[in-house]
C-alpha cells in the first residue's frame, strides 16, 4: 500500500519579540512523488465558531469549511499529544516569525520536571520569569503576560507543534500594545509538517517557512483537503483524522516508550539509553566527536548490585522511599579499572572538598559533571553513571568542612531539595549508597574542547587591572583571550609595545575558580558563557557579568596570574 503523507500548514505573524534563529536543517523531507493529503489551517481573527459548508471548485478540488469549537478540540488534542510524547530533548517557542530553541542549560535546569511530565514548568532566563504550559502549548512571560506558542521534539524525534499560532500571539500583542487585532498588520508564516502515517518508519519533519508580505487576513477557517480517497469528502476527512490519531497512538506504543529519556533509577538501562541520556544533557558542551559506553557486567559488579539493592530495601523501610537517582561522576582514566572491582571508594580518589562539604560529588546532568573531567593524552574524558540512594535529602548550607549528615533524619546532601542538581554522598555511604553502572568516555571536537577564548581588551577595571576591551586593530584582539593588565606606564605605551599574555581558554579559568565560589554562582557564569557562545550577549557584557558574579576582582587577578605562570 502506498504510504500517505499528511501535510499540515499553520499560520502566524511576527510579534517583534525575542531573537531569531534559523530552522533546523537536519530533517529530510519526503519524496514529492508520493500521494499526500494537504490540510491548511487558518483561524479567523474575528470568529470563534464557524458554520459548516461544503462546496466544490471548478478544478475538482474539494473544500470543506469546518465547524467546531476549535479551542476546546485543540485542547483535547494537545492533551493527547502531551500524554503520548516522550521526554522533550528540544523545546522551542515562536517569536519574530521564527522557532527559537530554549538554551540547553535551561533544559538541564528543568530536566527533572520534564521527566516528571509536569504540565507547567517555571524557570528564569536572562533575569525574566517564564512559565511553560505544555498542555495549552504556550510560553507565558509572568512579568508582561505575553504568550508565545510552544513546541517540542522528544527524545525519539517526534515533533509536537500547535495547530495554529494566529490568535494566541495576536491576543498577546493586543494585551501589551492595546492594538485592535483586526487592524494589526501581520505576516503569515506557514509551517509544513509532513508525516508518513502508514509506514513504520519514524516520521520526518520538513520545516518550510513561507513569508507572505501582503499581510491580508483570512476571513474564514478552512480545511482544504486533497486526497486519493475519492469524492467522499467527509469520509476523506474522517479517514485522515483517524490515520493521524493512529499514527500518534503508534508512537506511544512503540518508539516513545523505548526512547523516553531517563527511566526511573530502579529500572535497568542499556547502552543506547545511556547514550540518549548523555546526548540530552550534554548538548551544550559542543560537538561530541566520539562516544563510548561500557557497562560493568562482571560477577563482582553483580554482587555489588545485590548489596546495593539490599541497602535500597533498608532505606525504603526506614524512610518510606529509597529515592534512587541516576548521577554523573567525573573520573580519571587511571582509576576506572579499580572502580570496576571496588566501587567509588577506591583509594579515596572520588572524595573531594567543595563549598558544599567533603564527600563524593555527583550531578543530575552530564553537562555539569563533564566540565570537571580530566582530559587524558588522547583528549578523551570519562564519567561514571551511577545509581545513588539519596534517601532523605539534606539541604546543604555551604559548610565546606562538613563530611557527615547534619542529623539522623538525613541520608545524603543536595544543593536544592526541590530541584537538586548537585548531589553529595557522604564518605560513610559511598560503598553502600552508590552503584557505578556505566563508564561514558567521550571526546569533544577540538574547538569545543579548547573553548572560546576571551579577547585582550583595553579599558581596565580600575581596581583590578583586568583588561576588558582592547584597541581596534591590535594584534591581541583575538576571540577568547584573558589578560592581566600591566603597570600604569604600560597603559600609556603604544599597543604594539604592550606585553601580551598567553592564550587562556575560558574552561580553564572556570575550572580554576569553581572551587572558590558558590555552585549556584558557577552555574550563572556557565549560563552567561553559553549566551556569549550563542552571540546573545556581547563579550563586554559577559565580562561585566563575570565580574559581578565573582564579586572579587582580586580573586580573578590572582587566578589569571597563577594560570599564566602555569602556562609558561
Swiss-Prot record:
Q: What happens when the gene is disrupted?
A: No visible phenotype under normal growth condition.
Basic and acidic residues: bias regions: 1-18
Q: According to the record, what induces this protein's expression?
A: By salt stress.
Concerning Gene3D superfamilies, the annotation shows: 3.90.228.10
Q: Does the keyword Nucleus apply?
A: yes
Disordered: annotated span: 1-32, 220-241, 453-500
Molecular function (GO) terms for this protein are: NAD+ poly-ADP-ribosyltransferase activity
User: Which cell locations does it reside in?
Assistant: Nucleus matrix
One Pfam family assigned to this protein is: WWE_5
In which tissues or organs does this protein occur?
Answer: Expressed in young developing tissues, such as young leaves and flowers and root tips. In mature plants, expressed in vasculature of leaves and roots.
**What positions does the domain WWE occupy?**
77-152
Residue intervals of the RST domain: 497-568
Chief site of localization: nucleus
Keyword annotations of the record: Developmental protein, Nucleus, Stress response
Record-annotated PARP catalytic domain positions = 245-463
State the GO CC annotations: nuclear matrix
- Give the GO biological process terms: embryo development ending in seed dormancy; lateral root morphogenesis; photoperiodism, flowering; response to osmotic stress; response to oxidative stress; response to salt stress
Record function comment: Probable inactive ADP-ribosyltransferase that functions with RCD1 to regulate oxidative stress, hormonal and developmental responses. May regulate some stress-responsive genes. Seems to play a smaller developmental role than R.
Subunit structure, as described in the record: Interacts with DREB2A, DREB2B, DREB2C and NAC082.
State what protein this is by name.
Answer: Probable inactive poly [ADP-ribose] polymerase SRO1
This protein's species is: Arabidopsis thaliana (Mouse-ear cress)
Amino acid at each position: 500500500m502506498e504510504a500517505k503523507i499528511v501535510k499540515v500548514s499553520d499560520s502566524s505573524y511576527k510579534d517583534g519579540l525575542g531573537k531569531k534563529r534559523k530552522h533546523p536543517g537536519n530533517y529530510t523531507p519526503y519524496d514529492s512523488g508520493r500521494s499526500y493529503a494537504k490540510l491548511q489551517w487558518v483561524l479567523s481573527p474575528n470568529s470563534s465558531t464557524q458554520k459548516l459548508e461544503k462546496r466544490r471548485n471548478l478544478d475538482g478540488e474539494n473544500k470543506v469549511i469546518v465547524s467546531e469549537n476549535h479551542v476546546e478540540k485543540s485542547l483535547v488534542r494537545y492533551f493527547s499529544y502531551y500524554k503520548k510524547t516522550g521526554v522533550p530533548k528540544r523545546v522551542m517557542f515562536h517569536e519574530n516569525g521564527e522557532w527559537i530553541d530554549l538554551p540547553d542549560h535551561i533544559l538541564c535546569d528543568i530536566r527533572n520536571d520534564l521527566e516528571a511530565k509536569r504540565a507547567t514548568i517555571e524557570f528564569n532566563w536572562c533575569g525574566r520569569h517564564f512559565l511553560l504550559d505544555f498542555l495549552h502549548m504556550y510560553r507565558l512571560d509572568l512579568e508582561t503576560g505575553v504568550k508565545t506558542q510552544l513546541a517540542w521534539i522528544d527524545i525519539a524525534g517526534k515533533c509536537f507543534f500547535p495547530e495554529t499560532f494566529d490568535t494566541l500571539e495576536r491576543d498577546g500583542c493586543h494585551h501589551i500594545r492595546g492594538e485592535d487585532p483586526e487592524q494589526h498588520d501581520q505576516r503569515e508564516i506557514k509551517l509544513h509538517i509532513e508525516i508518513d502515517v502508514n509506514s513504520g518508519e519514524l516520521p520526518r519533519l520538513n520545516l518550510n517557512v513561507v513569508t507572505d508580505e501582503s499581510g491580508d487576513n483570512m476571513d474564514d477557517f478552512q480545511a482544504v483537503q486533497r486526497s486519493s480517497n475519492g469524492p467522499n469528502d467527509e469520509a476523506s476527512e474522517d479517514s485522515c483524522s483517524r490515520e493521524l490519531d493512529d499514527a500518534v497512538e503508534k508512537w506511544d506504543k512503540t518508539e516513545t516508550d523505548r526512547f523516553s529519556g531517563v527511566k526511573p533509577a530502579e529500572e535497568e538501562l542499556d547502552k543506547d539509553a545511556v547514550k540518549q541520556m548523555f546526548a540530552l544533557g550534554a548538548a551544550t558542551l559542543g560537538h561530541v566527536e566520539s562516544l563510548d559506553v561500557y557497562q560493568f557486567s562482571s560477577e563482582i559488579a553483580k554482587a555489588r548490585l545485590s548489596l546495593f539493592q539490599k541497602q535500597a530495601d533498608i532505606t525504603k523501610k526506614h524512610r518510606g522511599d529509597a529515592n534512587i537517582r541516576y548521577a554523573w561522576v567525573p573520573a580519571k582514566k587511571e582509576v576506572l579499572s579499580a572502580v570496576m572491582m571496588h566501587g567509588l571508594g577506591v583509594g579515596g580518589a572520588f572524595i573531594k572538598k567543595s563549598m558544599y562539604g567533603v564527600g563524593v560529588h555527583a550531578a543530575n546532568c552530564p553537562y555539569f559533571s563533564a566540565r570537571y573531567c580530566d582530559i587524558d593524552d588522547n583528549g578523551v574524558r570519562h564519567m561514571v553513571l551511577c545509581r545513588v540512594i539519596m534517601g532523605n535529602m539534606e539541604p546543604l548550607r555551604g559548610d565546606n568542612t562538613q563530611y557527615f549528615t547534619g542529623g539522623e533524619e538525613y541520608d545524603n546532601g543536595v544543593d536544592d531539595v526541590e530541584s537538586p542538581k548537585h548531589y553529595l554522598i557522604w564518605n560513610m555511604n559511598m560503598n553502600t549508597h552508590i552503584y557505578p553502572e556505566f563508564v561514558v568516555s567521550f571526546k569533544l571536537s577540538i574547538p569545543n574542547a579548547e573553548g572560546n577564548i576571551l579577547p585582550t581588551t583595553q579599558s581596565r577595571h580600575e581596581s583590578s587591572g583586568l583588561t576588558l576591551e582592547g584597541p581596534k586593530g591590535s594584534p591581541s584582539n583575538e576571540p577568547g583571550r584573558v589578560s592581566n593588565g600591566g603597570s600604569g606606564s604600560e597603559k600609556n605605551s603604544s599597543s604594539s609595545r604592550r606585553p601580551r599574555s598567553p592564550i587562556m581558554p575560558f574552561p580553564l579559568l572556570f575550572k580554576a575558580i569553581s572551587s572558590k565560589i558558590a555552585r549556584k554562582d558557577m552555574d550563572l557564569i556557565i549560563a552567561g558563557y553559553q549566551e556569549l557562545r550563542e552571540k546573545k550577549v556581547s563579550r563586554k557584557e559577559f565580562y561585566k557579568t563575570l565580574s559581578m558574579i565573582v564579586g572579587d576582582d582580586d580573586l580573578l587577578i590572582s587566578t589569571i596570574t597563577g594560570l599564566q605562570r602555569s602556562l609558561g
